[in-house]
Amino acid sequence: MSSTYKATGINLKAMPLGESDRLLTILTREYGLIRVVAPGARKPRSSLGGRSGLFVVNELLIAPGRSLHKLSQAETLTSYARLSKHLSTLTASQYLAELVIYQALSEQPQVELFDLLCYYLSWLEQSPEQEVLAVLSRAVFHLLEWAGIAPQVQQCCLTRRPITPDYTDPDWRIGFSCRAGGTVTSLAEALSLPASELQSTPAVPSRSAPALEHPHVYLTAIELEVLQHLSTSLPSSPTVSWSDLPPPSHYPTWVWLAIERTLRQYIQSYLDRPIRSAVLMDACFSPLSPAFS
C-alpha cells in the first residue's frame, strides 16, 4: 500500500509507545489483524484518546509505514463501554480478544470473525454477571468451531463410537483428552499412558504448568450434555440465535465454570500458549462466591 487506506476495525489491545503514543492491535473487516500507532493518543486532549480505547469500533484512515502503520483519523461507530461494569465481564471480553488475536489472519478479510466477536461482545455487555461464564463458554466454542478446531464431544475420538451421558450412575464420568482432541471412552488408551500416571495429573494445571503437558479432565454427565449442546446448536451466523439450547441460567454456574476450564485447557494445549486473561477469570469465579452459585 503506497497511500492511505480505510478500514473498519475494533481495538483488541493497546500498549503505551514512546512519550504519548499508543500501539494498537486492531481486527479489521477488510485487512484482518493490523498493528498501528495512534500518535499522541495518550495526551489529555487527543482526539484519538477515547477512540483508541479497548473494544471501540472505528472507521479508520491509516497511513502505511515501513515497520508500523500510522492512524491518521478515526471515527467511532460504536463502543462496548458497558463491558467494564463488572470485572468478570471485562475479563471475559479480554479473554475473547486474546483468542481472536491468536486466530485472526493479517492482510486478509476477516468479516465473519469480526462479526462473530462483535456479536458476543454485545451479548456479554447485556448479560447479568451470573451469566458471564455461560456466554463466554458459548463464544469460545463458537470461535473454535469457526476456526475448524472445536473439540469432538459427540463420540469417542479413539473408537468413533457415539457417547451418551449416563444420568443413572451418579459416579459416571467420561474422559476429555486435549491430545486426542476431545472425549475419549478410554483415557489411558487414548493417551498411551498408564492409568496411575493419568490419575496423578491435576485436572486443572497450575499457572506454571506448560501447555505441552496436554492436560486432561473427566466430565460429568451434565458437563458432557452442555458440551454436546454447544456443538450441535451453533447458530448459522452471528445474527441468528442459538437453537435448541437452554438459556444460560438453565445450568448452575459451577457447570459453566467446568466447561470454561475444559475449553481453556484444550485451547492452551492446541495453541501451545497460555490464555493470560484466564488468570483473572479464576480470581473472579474460583472459588465461587454465593453470588455465582
UniProtKB/Swiss-Prot annotation:
Keyword Zinc: no
GO terms for biological process, alphabetical: DNA recombination; double-strand break repair
Top-level division of the source organism's lineage: Bacteria
InterPro entries according to UniProt: ARFGAP/RecO, DNA_rep/recomb_RecO_N, NA-bd_OB-fold, RecO, RecO_C
Keyword DNA damage attributed: yes
Keyword line: DNA damage, DNA recombination, DNA repair
One matching Pfam family: RecO_N
Entry-linked SUPFAM superfamilies: ArfGap/RecO-like zinc finger, Nucleic acid-binding proteins
Function: Involved in DNA repair and RecF pathway recombination.
Sequence similarity: Belongs to the RecO family.
Protein name: DNA repair protein RecO
Lineage per the UniProt record: Bacteria, Bacillati, Cyanobacteriota, Cyanophyceae, Gomontiellales
